[in-house]
Amino acid sequence: MSGNSPFGTFFLPGPTEVRPEVLQSMLQPMLPHRGAAFEELFARIQRGLKPIFRTQRPVYVSSSSATGLMEAAIRCARPGAILCLVNGAFSERFANIAQSCGRDATVVGGEWSAPVSLDAVEQALKARPYAALTVVHSETSTGVLTDIQALTELAHRYDCAVLVDSVTGLAGVPVETDAWNLDFVLTGSQKALALPPGLAFGVASEKFIAEAGQAEGRGLYYDLVEFEQYVHKNQTPNTPALSLLYATAVQGERIAKESIERRWDRHTRMMEHTHSWVHELRQRVGAEFGVYAPFDACTSTVTAVTVPIGVSSDAIVKGVARRGFVIGGGYGKLKANTFRIGHMGDHTMEGLDAVLEATAETIEEVLDL
Ligand SMILES: *Cc1c(COP(=O)(O)O)cnc(C)c1O
């Protein structure tokens, strides 16, 4: 991508396209990260992020990608077994992290085409006690959205904490951290927040962080107990990725200006528009293109489009690139038979129309219509 392309050409489901003024904000001089100027910057970031998380709790800022805070969630969950809900590539990663941190982890689910059912979760919770469960709110590999409010209600009846990866949920679809009593919810900078990659943000409930002290082997870099201590001083435990913090402050203010509710609505409209486009495309070209996610569990931020047998999703992605737009290929086991359009972050309906038109043209070319 050339640095001179106009905004509205990059529809990867992460990293997402960043507004020029947000990029520009990173070109500020360094600051000592212990001192008043930094604390002011950090407080500004908190004012931006808290309404996005819908929380009164402080927002931890980790200089890592989102996977870092997934690991932190596992390391800091109170002692006990962990139930991992798997319905896609990223929820599978969460389960792998639990196992690789030496936790007693049980997987429930496994099907990619829908959320893990509450029945299956309840069966598992009845069978034995779990300290926590892991869930991916918006599965970026499939476009499937899980109802984390209902899941949390259920889990809390069994005294099981809920660790939520909302990496492509937060700032694109409603997340009510406080009202839904989420124990820990995390995201990365480079998805629906439309910041460059390199930061992760998370919120822990008071109960979760109080119990985290009992977790042994939390390590150092991802010890949320440390994050909690520093966040109250408007600081981070270690040297933060300062340039990205400048961008976060500016983006938080941009999002406040739009309002989080309007941002959610814009994402809903982008999702609906993309889905209608898929259905019209299928009719027009007479080939089995479809939306992978079930109609009642779609995320607003990304659509995985299934392609008919015999059509190469890779050829579609490459043809779209020749027209000046970036979309995503399939992910994991859906690599060959889906492509993905990331309609999240700061994209507009007009921008989305342009990439969909380029994609339709490409498909007609690939099908030789
Ligand atoms: C992108 C993504 C991640 C991983 O994020 P990194 O920033 O690459 O570590 C985790 N979960 C979901 C749902 C994602 O979309």
What spans do the regions from the language model cover?
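Conserved PLP-dependent catalytic core of the aminotransferase class-I/II
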Residues: 44-53, 253-291
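Active-site C-terminal subdomain of aminotransferase-like
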Residues: 17-18, 190-276
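Active-site phosphate-binding strand-loop segment of PLP-dependent enzymes
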Residues: 116-171
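A glycine-/small-polar-enriched, mobile loop at the entrance of the PLP active site in fold-type I
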Residues: 5-63
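PLP-dependent enzyme catalytic core of the Aspartate aminotransferase-like
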Residues: 3-5, 333, 337-369
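Conserved beta-loop-alpha segment that forms the PLP phosphate-binding cup at the N-terminus of a helix
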Residues: 56-83, 87, 91-95
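Conserved PLP-binding catalytic core of the aspartate aminotransferase-like
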Residues: 287-319
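Conserved active-site segment immediately N-terminal to the catalytic lysine
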Residues: 178-190
